[in-house]
Amino acid sequence: MYRPLVARLLRDSVATRKGSSHFARRFSHSLPFATVDAEELSGAKPAEVLNLVQGNWGGSSSWHTVVDPLNGEPFIKVAEVDETEIKPFVESLSKCPKHGLHNPFKSPERYLLYGDISTKAGHMLSIPKVSEFFARLIQRVAPKSYHQALGEVQVTQKFFENFTGDQVRFLARSFGVPGNHLGQQSNGFRWPFGPVAIITPFNFPLEIPVLQLMGALYMGNKPLLKVDSKVSIVMEQMMRLLHYCGLPVGDADFVNSDGKAMNKILLEANPRMTLFTGSSRVAEKLALDLKGRIKLEDAGFDWKILGPDVNEADYVAWVCDQDAYACSGQKCSAQSILFMHENWAATPLISRLKELAERRKLEDLTVGPVLTVTTEAMLDHLNKLLQIPGAKLLFGGKPLENHTIPSIYGAVKPTAVYVPLEEILKVSNYELVTKEIFGPFQVVTEYKNSQLPMVLEALERMHAHLTAAVVSNDQLFLQEVIGNTVNGTTYAGLRARTTGAPQNHWFGPAGDPRGAGIGTPEAIKLVWSCHREIIYDIGPVSHHWEIPPST
């Protein structure tokens, strides 16, 4: 199915392109869908990010400049629409009916179309030149190690592979229940919302928007996608790849804007459902503005508990380091607080964590710029924590050295601060200690067997319930902790982690009816479709039937 596409890609890669400057630019990088070269992005060769609406790519009246997070050089110009330019996007969404672009009774062949698109897109991302392109582009705008960036591409590829062939139409599987009499039967269907919106953050420029965009499209919706402008170049290029793989250009719109303009689009277009991934503050505002027509995957102050059984100390330390500091802690699933059983506190765990954290360096981006929290803000938070009685700095707590990261971003060494459990629970301290710092920063504390109820109390009082880890193979301990907590994605066992949002299991919060999942069939059906019941009652009516008395 995808062989002609791949052959075309390879043929285009070696062909000499002539003609207009557009095509020279478009194909100069040997990838027929690409309009940029990740390696060449610079102030001297800035890239441009456009908008897509009603099947056409276009600019705006003004350009927003994105600076290189590693050196501060302006290197990307984003065509951000302002409040006077939103009409085409509002009209485009408004043209989509509530019953969607397809549903089980309308254009069912489009389920097969999206199976084909997924097949082609998955294979495209398996081509080393293509996966390298996206991994490097991610690194340029959301600096993380190459391993982390490539992992994001690979998860996206596997997601596409999961929804090839008939798998898209299987998402719309219905059921039937026998009725009360001959000719009656009730049938349940998954139904699209129609016009929808997707808003995604900077930290996963490819994985989050692709998985949510495709989920929306699979179920028959028409989405308007907005990605944080700092990183939207990645998804703009992915949209072009999807068009190359057969995505109809009018099926999805792509907009660059600030929050104010996007909010106005939502209020005027009135999408039937909006998916928001990002900060809790914005999430709560949108929930009010959109009158509840929203699904959220917002901030997470994610916890890890080390149980009483101490095993594989080096492995556990390595996972803790990865959970807290990979991507410079800029994951919504990053380990924010570590509860150590006293048995673990008696081991060299903290010194091992310190050694692992100190291996991280800017040169390979195992630590790097923090895009939403400044250095001053992180150090100020640290200093406030250190005012708590018994608190102490375990490691880090200093700015990165010898760098050119602009001051609008953060640059600190991986940091851990110890706060006594008794102090954490105090009303005067709790909100401070559990404030999410979206950077390489974690709180560490210790507990005894008798203090497990205190740990559970601390978890119960948290507001966000995204990911969690219970590191123990003690079945009774696991049962106690899992039974008294709520986090939507909870890893349990010796190898438990807080991070890792692959395509093979649910990732999302629990405990909130607005909670959104991502990636799996269950998540797609929950977020991007609703239940519709159709009751057939075709008769026959008995020949002996008579009009009964009124009731």
Swiss-Prot record:
NAD(+) binds at residues 278-283. The record marks 203 as: Transition state stabilizer. InterPro entries: Ald_DH/histidinol_DH, Ald_DH_C, Ald_DH_CS_CYS, Ald_DH_N, Aldehyde_DH_dom, ALDH7A1-like. Its EC number is 1.2.1.3. In uninfected plants, highest levels found in stems. In plants infected with the flax rust, highest levels in leaves. Higher levels of expression in infected leaves than uninfected stems. Keywords: NAD, Oxidoreductase. GO terms for cellular component: mitochondrion. One of its GO terms (biological process) is proline catabolic process to glutamate. The keyword Secreted does not apply. Could be involved in facilitating the biotrophic relationship between the plant and the rust fungus. Belongs to the aldehyde dehydrogenase family. This is Probable aldehyde dehydrogenase. The lineage of its organism: Eukaryota, Viridiplantae, Streptophyta, Embryophyta, Tracheophyta. The gene is FIS1.
